[in-house]
Regions:
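Core transmembrane alpha-helical segments of multi-pass membrane transporters/permeases
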Residues: 1-13, 207-246, 262, 266-279
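Hydrophobic transmembrane alpha-helices that form the pore/transport pathway of multi-pass ion
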Residues: 18-84, 282-320
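Hydrophobic alpha-helical transmembrane segments in multi-pass membrane proteins
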Residues: 29-30, 84-93, 120-125, 158, ...
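Hydrophobic alpha-helical transmembrane segments
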Residues: 31-33, 42, 100, 110, 159-160, 164-173, 181, 276-278, ...
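Residue-level recognition of pore/gate-forming positions within transmembrane alpha-helices
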Residues: 39, 81, 100, 116-117, ...
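Membrane-embedded alpha-helical segments of transport systems
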Residues: 41, 73-95, 111-127, 317-320
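Long, contiguous bundles of hydrophobic transmembrane helices that form the permeation core
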Residues: 111-223
Length: 320
């Protein structure tokens, strides 16, 4: 809901324009802007599909125009948008589920997930640079790149709700639900104040704000439907596996295959994640695999002399 409201208010377009202003003039600038824009959009959106639609509509045509093939342009956009789910503080619904699974605060999840998310985007940035070098591509023309200072200050109000969210999570240590709630309320009022100041007619400004808010609520509800159904279905699977004793038998089979070899066990976990990922969204996939494999990984690791923190195991499952 928070991401949908921010996107409806123009936050997604702002982050994309800011990305183009920052890296558009570099070699292969559109690809780097797509990666940076998707990463910043991932700050507010936990949906890879919404991220792809928001940024890809603008970045893919520009990447093709500057020399990238349509396949590479699509691959760069999709990979950077999918990685948006790894970017704190939102991280999709999986981060909230992970916090309840492990029994730690949401802040702990965000703290441990921040560096891997940055590393993933640095890797994408580097790969896009190598592709641009290989194709001998140049940056965008000065006339096509927005002014950085002007672009940054044009949407400064979009950063306020994000700072509210981070402040409440990090410094006040509020729960994720409370933090998101107050950040959403601040977003609604900040957008109202901005439109009231920007618009010439207060009545028209209020009408625009009201329409944006309603559309944001609708998009947020639609985004939650798919996630809710997937999590509910995954919960049924997890409950059935636990109640029938299949989990115990599965653990015995996996341990007999791995034979206390942690590397083999990690590889089997990756394969299971990838297979389930063909038909399940990220959150549902994480719920199923974490319920089956997280404890096994910790136990086998301890038996082999390795100490696997539970949060590291859950993040491993989440990433694959």
């Amino acid at each position: 809901l928070f991401g949908a409201l921010l996107e409806t208010a123009g936050g997604g377009k702002y982050f994309l324009d800011l990305a183009f202003a920052m890296v558009g003039k570099m070699r292969g600038g559109p690809a780097k802007a797509a990666i940076l824009g998707s990463g910043m959009t991932g700050l507010i959106s936990g949906s890879s599909i919404a991220n792809t639609v928001t940024t890809g509509t603008f970045t893919i045509p520009i990447m093709k125009k500057t020399g990238f093939s349509k396949e590479k342009a699509g691959a760069i956009e999709v990979s950077s948008s999918v990685n948006g789910q790894l970017m704190p503080p939102v991280m999709g619904a999986a981060a909230f589920v992970m916090a309840s699974f492990i029994g730690v605060t949401y802040f702990e999840i965000v703290k441990h997930a921040f560096l891997p998310a940055i590393i993933s985007y640095v890797a994408l940035f580097y790969i896009s640079h190598l592709e641009a070098l290989k194709l001998n591509l140049k940056g965008m023309d000065d006339a096509e790149v927005p002014n950085l200072k002007k672009t940054f200050f044009s949407g400064l109000h979009f950063l306020i709700p994000i700072f509210v969210l981070i402040y409440m999570l990090v410094y006040l240590r509020f729960t994720a639900s409370y933090s998101i709630f107050y950040a959403t309320i601040s977003l609604i009022f900040v957008n109202l104040i901005y439109l009231s100041i920007k618009g010439e007619n207060l009545k028209n400004s209020f009408k625009i704000w009201f329409n944006q808010t309603i559309v944001g609520f609708e998009k947020g509800a639609l985004n939650m439907v798919g996630v809710g159904i997937a999590i509910a279905t995954a919960g049924i699977i997890v409950g059935a596996v636990g109640s029938t004793g299949l989990s115990t038998n599965l653990i015995i089979v996996i341990e007999s295959i791995a034979k206390d070899n942690v590397s083999i066990l990690l590889f089997l976990t990756i394969i299971l994640c990838l297979l389930l990922g063909m038909g399940l969204p990220t959150t549902a996939n994480y719920v199923v695999v974490a319920s089956l494999m997280a404890t096994v990984l910790v136990d086998v690791g301890n038996a082999s002399g390795f100490i696997f923190p539970l949060i590291a195991v859950h993040l491993f499952v989440f990433y694959f």
